[in-house]
A protein has these predicted regions:
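Extracytoplasmic assembly/pore-lining segments of large envelope/extracellular complexes
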Residues: 8-12, 56-59
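C-terminal outer-membrane beta-barrel translocator/porin domains of Gram-negative envelope proteins
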Residues: 26-172
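Polar, glycine-rich mid-to-C-terminal structural blocks
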Residues: 10-31, 47
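Phosphate/diphosphate-binding loops
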Residues: 1
Length: 173
């Protein structure tokens, strides 16, 4: 893959970045050592992203927005002219948005923090699995460890309160 990233603005509290990434994705699937042609594909994706981080109300706000475009280049699968709208597209377009706010505070002298994370995407086309949004891990939805959900469009919003609780073993902490 190839990546360009540039800081376009910076001051004491704010930083803005713009970036572009060109990625080739080579998917090879097998079942019992048998190559599965129908579910194996090569995709080329151009991602254009922007991000901003700034201090806000005593915390830190991070925002990311992006566009991903599937390209017909560098050996990628090419969509046929008569491809139905219900079939996955190698030449696709999807939009991504991420917001994250972290706020440190203290309660009765104990340090704690609040974080709120929003992540979402919207696709104009049906996507192959490698491009779909996937939720179902400790990092997206608590309690979703064994099961996952995926789709062309989706979002999740996760809020978290955390603090450190010291454990004491005898005379040591």
């Amino acid at each position: 893959y190839a990546k360009l990233d540039r800081v376009v603005y910076r001051d004491q509290t704010t930083r803005a970045n713009l970036g572009a990434t060109l990625t080739t994705k080579d998917s090879r699937n097998y079942l019992n050592d048998q190559f599965l042609q129908v579910s194996s594909r090569d995709l080329t994706v151009l991602d254009l992203d922007g991000s901003l981080s700034t201090r806000l109300f005593g915390g830190v706000l991070m925002m990311e927005a992006g566009l991903a475009q599937g390209l017909d280049t560098l050996g990628a699968l090419s969509d046929p002219a008569n491809l139905p709208d219900t079939a996955p597209h190698a030449q696709f377009r999807k939009y991504k948005l991420g917001l994250n706010y972290q706020y440190p505070f203290s309660v009765f002298g104990q340090e704690a923090s609040f974080s709120s994370l929003f992540s979402g995407q919207h696709a104009e086309d049906v996507l192959y699995g490698s491009e779909q949004m996937l939720i179902g891990s400790l990092y997206s939805v608590r309690g979703f460890v064994r099961n996952t959900l995926s789709g062309d469009h989706g979002y999740y919003w996760r809020n978290e309160l955390s603090t450190r609780i010291p454990l004491r073993f005898g005379d040591t902490t």
